[in-house]
């Protein structure tokens, strides 16, 4: 198995291919990407044996922007016999994976492939039993062992492979299953909820998304992102010249400032800054840098709207510029970006300041005083 399969949003195969080619080369792994437009996945074929496994282990999945999932696969299995689809799949995995912890029978995220989902769910049960019988899978699921993947791209045609549980997406098809809240102001609320799932480890939610925290939402109207912050019992300053939905204002947790998000200056410190404004990505990232450099927030989640062409290059340049500005100002920060399932022509970025790395900075001293006061 010397191919890497990467799931992505249909229409972004070229961006996904450009990214994996760049990231692989940085690890001195070389190959070429096979791209089929609107297929929802990309194949990266490595020139050297075992290089796909090297990428699956050493290339941090969290650093990939356009990939929803990353796995090692073999040759395409074609024309699986309807009377026995299981034997060829088991044969390809025999001796490749031992003691896998989970089986996922998946499809690309396309309208055509979704017709196969019902089959995949039914097929999973007998296939899992057969793989356990030959010890490719453990008898019980184990979240710390490799995940076995079967990716059906058409009836009777699939790629078979595996991913490492500590370097993949934990979600089926790489997509978190979120339910739209009936009382949310807009569907954009799911973007921020998904961002929390992707960027913030579940065991850190109470600490980093806790009750009573202070947050600012730039470009808040009508309140989709503010809704998520309110649900986490935060106190929110909503910045927008437009109206907020009355239900959010009635909570008593939201203060609405009718102001331009690019001109607003907070009076105090904040734990969170979120921003989903429709503006050029360079302008938004510069605004985020200003907030972080001035110590106006600890963490930020924001969207960068993508141009029609050179989308990977545009995002890479904006992230590099942001990182450089923070570095020049003595800010030690973690930066991550991902095109989420609920994103469209955009990517979502998360920045977290690393506290204690820059002792004595003005903003750190102010936070320490506030913590002592509280």
Curated annotation (Swiss-Prot):
Its EC number is 2.1.1.186. Pfam families: FtsJ, RlmM_FDX, RLMM_N. S-adenosyl-L-methionine binds at residues 188, 221-224, 240, 260, 276. The active site is at 305 (proton acceptor). GO terms for biological process: methylation; rRNA processing. Keywords: Cytoplasm, Methyltransferase, rRNA processing, S-adenosyl-L-methionine, Transferase. One of its GO terms (molecular function) is S-adenosylmethionine-dependent methyltransferase activity. Monomer. Belongs to the class I-like SAM-binding methyltransferase superfamily. RNA methyltransferase RlmE family. RlmM subfamily. This is Ribosomal RNA large subunit methyltransferase M.
């Amino acid at each position: 198995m010397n191919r890497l399969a990467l799931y992505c949003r249909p229409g972004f195969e070229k961006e996904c291919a450009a990214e994996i080619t760049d990231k692989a080369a940085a690890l001195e792994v070389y190959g070429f990407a096979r791209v089929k437009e609107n297929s929802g996945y990309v194949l990266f074929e490595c020139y050297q044996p075992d290089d796909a496994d090297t990428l699956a282990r050493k290339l941090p999945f969290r650093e990939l922007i356009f990939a929803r999932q990353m796995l090692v696969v073999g040759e395409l299995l074609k024309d699986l016999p309807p009377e026995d689809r299981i034997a060829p799949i088991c044969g390809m995995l025999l001796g490749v994976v031992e003691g896998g912890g989970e089986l996922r029978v998946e499809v690309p995220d396309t309208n055509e492939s979704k017709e196969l989902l019902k089959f995949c769910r039914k097929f999973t049960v007998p296939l899992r039993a057969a793989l356990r019988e030959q010890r490719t899978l453990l008898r019980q699921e184990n979240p710390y062992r490799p995940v076995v993947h079967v990716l059906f791209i058409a009836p009777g045609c699939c790629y078979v492979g595996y991913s490492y549980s500590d370097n993949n997406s934990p979600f089926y098809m790489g997509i978190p299953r979120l339910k739209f809240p009936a009382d949310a102001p807009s569907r954009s609320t799911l973007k921020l909820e998904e961002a929390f799932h992707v960027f913030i480890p579940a065991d850190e939610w109470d600490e980093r998304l806790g009750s009573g925290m202070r947050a600012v939402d730039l470009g808040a109207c009508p309140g989709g992102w503010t809704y998520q912050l309110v649900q986490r019992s935060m106190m929110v300053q909503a910045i927008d010249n437009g109206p907020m939905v009355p239900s959010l204002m009635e909570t008593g947790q939201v203060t609405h400032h009718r102001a331009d998000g690019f001109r607003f200056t907070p009076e105090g410190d904040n734990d969170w800054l979120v921003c989903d404004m429709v503006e050029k990505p360079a302008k938004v990232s510069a605004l985020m840098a200003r907030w972080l450099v001035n110590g106006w927030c600890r963490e930020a989640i924001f969207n960068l709207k993508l141009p029609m062409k050179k989308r990977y290059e545009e995002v890479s340049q904006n992230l590099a510029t942001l990182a450089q500005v923070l570095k020049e100002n003595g800010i030690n920060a973690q930066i991550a970006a991902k095109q989420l399932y609920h994103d469209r022509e955009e990517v979502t970025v998360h920045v977290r300041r690393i506290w204690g790395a820059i002792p004595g900075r003005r903003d750190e001293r102010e936070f320490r005083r506030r913590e002592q006061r509280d």
